[in-house]
Design a protein with these regions (language model features):
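Sequence-structural signature of mature extracellular/luminal beta-sheet repeat domains
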Residues: 1-282
Length: 282
């Protein structure tokens, strides 16, 4: 099925899948974070069996997730009024958990929202003040930044500091362009060239989202950009022109998966849906 036409959707599982979708090819499993209530859990959907299990019952208001180049699960822990926000790293085999980073220049993070791992090992994440605005985090002490963390030097750098509410982020296939969704008013998808050394430059608005907000962002092998909104997943070319859409009301986030990375797994708070494409995730 072409990405330019509506692919057939099938419901994979009924479960409280909200954010952080990650496909682990070595397990043929789909990881996600649950709908925020008193707590948020990290769960695992075994795709072959269709069974859901709890990986971490209380995950500190976890939101976005990604696999790093070693296969560990990077988790955006938004934190609470009493627990600090951080980026953590979870060993899927043992359950061992460690802090990657929890502060910038000695100041606590706001509420990390989404994360992407670059091929050079650096970790990029957005840190909007959503937690404070939603009443489960203290007043922010820093701006709503996009950060780059270098595990080798342990240096955390604010690479973008002019966005209102940065949310989803993803790289182009060659990692020379960084895409970021801004959920402030107005709602935009932005694109930035990434120079050697890992700093975004020469960027700006690629596409406007009205009235919905861009949330999850992914890119396929051809460089097409996929962005979730409340009405489904929109597909844009590198110029920001919409060239397709997967209509699914209530869509929150998504990821490419399957052995060939040609299935889009989409969370909608009450279920996980799948759309088979003839394009592959980058």
């Amino acid at each position: 099925m072409s990405v330019l036409t509506a692919p057939r959707l099938r419901r994979v599982a009924e479960t409280d899948a909200h954010e952080g979708p990650v496909y682990a090819a070595d397990e043929d499993a789909f990881y996600f974070t649950t709908v925020r209530r008193e707590r948020v859990a990290i769960k695992r959907l075994a795709l072959a069996e269709g069974t859901v299990s709890v990986v971490r019952a209380d995950a500190n208001m976890a939101n976005g997730m990604a696999l790093d180049r070693e296969g560990f699960l990077l988790v955006c822990e938004q934190g609470t009024l009493t627990e600090p926000a951080r980026i953590s790293r979870l060993d899927r085999a043992t359950g061992e958990l460690e802090t990657v980073v929890d502060s910038w220049n000695g100041l606590p993070l706001n509420s990390p929202n989404d994360v992407a791992a670059a091929r050079d090992g650096t970790i990029w994440f957005t840190d909007p003040s959503h937690g404070y605005l939603q009443g489960f985090r203290p007043e922010p002490q820093t701006g709503d930044h996009v950060y780059r963390y270098d595990p080798a030097s342990r240096e955390l750098t604010a690479v973008l500091d002019s966005l209102d509410k940065p949310n989803g982020l993803a790289f182009s296939p060659d990692e020379r362009v960084l895409y970021v969704g801004d959920n402030g008013a107005p709602h935009h998808l932005l694109a930035y060239d990434v120079e050697d050394g890992g700093r975004p430059v020469r960027g700006g608005v690629l596409a406007a989202f009205t009235p919905e907000q861009p949330d999850g962002i992914k890119v396929d092998e051809q460089g097409r950009i996929y962005a979730s909104a409340a009405d489904g997943v929109r597909i844009l070319d590198e110029r920001g022109e919409q060239i397709g859409e997967i209509e699914l009301p209530g869509a929150v986030n998504f990821t490419f998966g399957g052995p060939a990375r040609d299935v889009l797994y989409i969370t909608v708070d009450t279920a996980v849906w799948a759309a088979e494409l003839d394009s592959k995730g980058a």
